[in-house]
From Swiss-Prot:
Coiled coil: none annotated. The lineage of its organism: Eukaryota, Viridiplantae, Streptophyta, Embryophyta, Tracheophyta. InterPro entries: CRR_secretory_protein (IPR050581), GNK2 (IPR002902), GNK2_sf (IPR038408). It comes from Arabidopsis thaliana. This is Putative cysteine-rich repeat secretory protein 24. GO terms for cellular component: extracellular region. PROSITE patterns: GNK2. Gene3D superfamilies: Gnk2 domain, C-X8-C-X2-C motif (3.30.430.20). Belongs to the cysteine-rich repeat secretory protein family. Residues 39-141, 147-259 form the Gnk2-homologous domain. It comes from the Eukaryota. Pfam families: Stress-antifung.
Length: 262
């Protein structure tokens, strides 16, 4: 396995998040807590080609995953590259900002095991869990926003009372968290870099929300990515008590119950 010099640099600048991708919007009902680490979705990317089971390419992937796993004790975002040309292996893995180290490492093991089962021979494949997401690709995408692959989930319960007022206040709170996550005061190389979560009182109810970007993005691109997925709020979650939109580059979630660790 060969690792580029930039890979080591990226590993030392590791951090945290939870994302994974899908090519067409998908609607699900969700009522999940952080403790469950529920499987959310996966995608097998056919356009990047395939490899044979038992091939050197497959062995190289496992070696790279094992190598990156050892860094999770210090970081919750890891990125690695192995190979040259069409046989490139690019791995990005990130845990959600509130996920503890042990859960983060466990999530990587679970994600890698499941994606091998769901997309056994695809070079490009992504899987999302509540606590993490794993992105395997033959294309180098470090620092780039993925606009192609995204999906949404929503809480089956409808908002009671004034839905327009709720939507307006919820959207404003998400943008407030976006500003915090992408602020220059947000220090790189810490667990919750490019992550923000909080609680807001809306009359008699409390709104809980979080936003996060993958830590390979610049602060500017984090803002761009979150602005982009928030445009999907009307189709995702209008009138719902909770919802989320996820892409491989950023995501947000809101609920009327706590779902992140303090």
């Amino acid at each position: 396995m060969s690792l580029s010099s930039s890979v080591t640099k990226h590993l030392i600048s590791a951090s945290i998040l939870a994302i994974v991708a899908m090519q067409l919007p998908s609607v699900h009902s969700v009522l999940s807590l952080n403790e469950t680490n529920a499987y959310l979705h996966h995608i097998c990317i056919n356009g990047e080609g395939t490899f044979k089971s038992g091939s050197p390419y497959e062995k190289e992937i496992k070696q790279l995953i094992d190598f990156l796993s050892s860094f999770i004790k210090d970081y919750s975002f890891v990125h690695g590259v192995s190979g040259i040309g069409p046989d490139d292996i690019n791995v990005k893995f990130q845990c959600r900002g509130d996920t503890l180290q042990a859960k983060c490492r466990s999530c990587l093991a679970t994600a890698f095991s499941e994606i091998r089962s769901k997309c056994p021979n695809n070079k490009g494949r992504i899987i999302w869990y509540d606590n993490c997401h794993l992105d395997l690709s033959s294309i180098y995408t470090y620092g780039q926003i993925d606009y192609k692959n995204n999906f949404y989930m929503y809480n089956a319960k409808d908002v009671r009372g004034d839905k327009k007022s709720f939507y307006k206040n919820m959207k404003a709170f998400l943008h407030k968290l976006k500003a915090k996550a992408s602020s220059k005061e947000n220090k790189p190389y810490v667990k919750d870099y490019m992550y923000a979560a909080g609680r807001e009182s809306l009359g008699t109810v409390k709104l809980y929300a979080m936003v996060q970007c993958t830590q390979d993005l610049s602060l500017k691109n984090c803002t761009v990515c979150l602005d982009w997925i928030m445009t999907k709020l009307p189709e995702c979650c209008n009138g719902k008590q909770g919802g989320r939109v996820l892409s491989p580059s950023c995501n947000f979630r809101y609920e009327l119950y706590p779902f992140v660790e303090n």
